[in-house]
Amino acid sequence: MRRKWRSEDFHFVFFGVLCLLLIDRGKLEQVKHSDTYCVFQDKKYRVGERWHPYLEPYGLVYCVNCLCSENGNVLCSRIRCPSLHCPSPVHVPQLCCPRCPEDSLFSVSSKITGKSCEYNGTTYHHGEMFVAEGLFQNRQANQCAQCSCSEGNVYCGLKTCPKLTCSFPVSVPESCCPVCRGDGELSWEQADGDIFRQPANREARHSYHRPHYELSPSSTRQVVNVPRFPSARSNRGVLPDPQQASGTIVQIVINNKHKHGRVCVSNGKTYSHGESWHPNLRAFGIVECVLCTCNITKQECKKIHCPEQYPCKYPQKVEGKCCKVCPEEVPSQSFDNKDYFCGKETFPVYESIFTEEGETIRKIAVETEKPPQIEIHVWTIRKGILRHFYIEKMSKREFEELPYFKQITRTTSSQWKIFSEGEAQISQMCESRVCRTELEDLVKVLYLEKSEKGHC
């Protein structure tokens, strides 16, 4: 199941961009047995393979096509739909563009691949969307839970529904929010608040579960509630304003260990049953000496009592811990002369900006270790609109010969992953409008800064 697109939301006549790169069959045979492949959102693709990106919690975006080129670069482009001359075009599942009714009888070439999901006894296909009942116990009357399935994991969003102007709204399968009759064909380009974008504080939480980036079934979830990419320097999560006019997404990943799907929400962050965390008070920051635990849907907090006597003579106070620890328990800080941020290794980020005849080519590059190479993300911007982006890779030696790059910051692999995922979303979002702010906010995701009182 997917979001339907309506042609009247677009302002220009669109022509199909169905072929990103013509690859000769002979060349394909030459690389078939080579080690060349592309990596996009942690998934490997063979040379010549095409796919639609997956955006949480909307599912597969059929209006963006990605291709793995022969040199291992990922090329993504929007599909531009032609204008139709029939009065009532219809939308076909798994396709981007609407069709005239007389042309709608054809086979769908796209195949859904990916692991299915199980939620509350129901099996959902990869990319399928559905509505969850009883997931958020403390939701407002105008909020609902929208979920989707991706590679065996369930992604859910607490969505604040926009105010409706009609007297008799109707339900549609693509959204948990009711809509006015005639608005059932939801467009991707709805109100800005209803567009999912990755935040800078995706890892800015304090629980005893490992950070979620592998999308494994046992992983925890992360709260998202931002109308645009926030700066990496702002790490506070805020619950949605139920009075706002546009929809809002608070995204979580359901822990498959707890099939009931009940969660606790604390300070804008979502925790599953049994998960523990230290509360974050605005005036004091993280309170290490108070421990909260999610019990089904209720928070149970208690004070941590430190021992009166320690096995060592001179226990030390360690940042981020409530009780003192003995010196032999203090973790070593030797990091092999590498730069670290909050215990995570950082990598240099480079930037190059070239402007000519009203067109700006902006390149963001990062140095990776596995494999040791430089990954460069290239944006083509014309009059503030992101027209095209692609990814290229080169060796470190080749990169060092380029004179026009300068280092702008250092970042972690997790922040670089957020940046990479955000490109596909911004490309879709900024199809026909100026997105200077969104692009700048996306770059800010790469900048690192400790939160209040130096906590990570």
UniProtKB/Swiss-Prot annotation:
Provide the taxonomic classification.
Answer: Eukaryota, Metazoa, Chordata, Craniata, Vertebrata
Residue ranges annotated as motif Cell attachment site? 181-183
**Superkingdom to which the source organism belongs:** Eukaryota
Q: Which residues are glycosylated?
A: 120, 295
Question: Which UniProt keywords are listed?
Answer: Developmental protein, Glycoprotein, Repeat, Secreted, Signal
Read off the Pfam families from this record.
CHRDL_1_2_C, VWC
**Where are the disulfide bridges?**
none
Give the signal peptide, or none. 1-28
Which protein is depicted? Chordin-like protein 1
Q: Does the keyword S-adenosyl-L-methionine apply?
A: no
Gene Ontology MF terms in the entry: BMP binding
**GO BP term, example:** negative regulation of BMP signaling pathway
Note whether Signal occurs among the keywords: yes
Q: What does this protein do?
A: Seems to antagonize the function of BMP4 by binding to it and preventing its interaction with receptors.
Might you report a single GO cellular component term? extracellular region
Tissue expression summary = Mainly expressed in the ventral retina.
* VWFC domain mapped to chain residues: 36-101, 115-181, 262-327
Cell location: Secreted
InterPro entries given in the database record: CHRDL1/2, CHRDL_1/2_C, VWF_dom
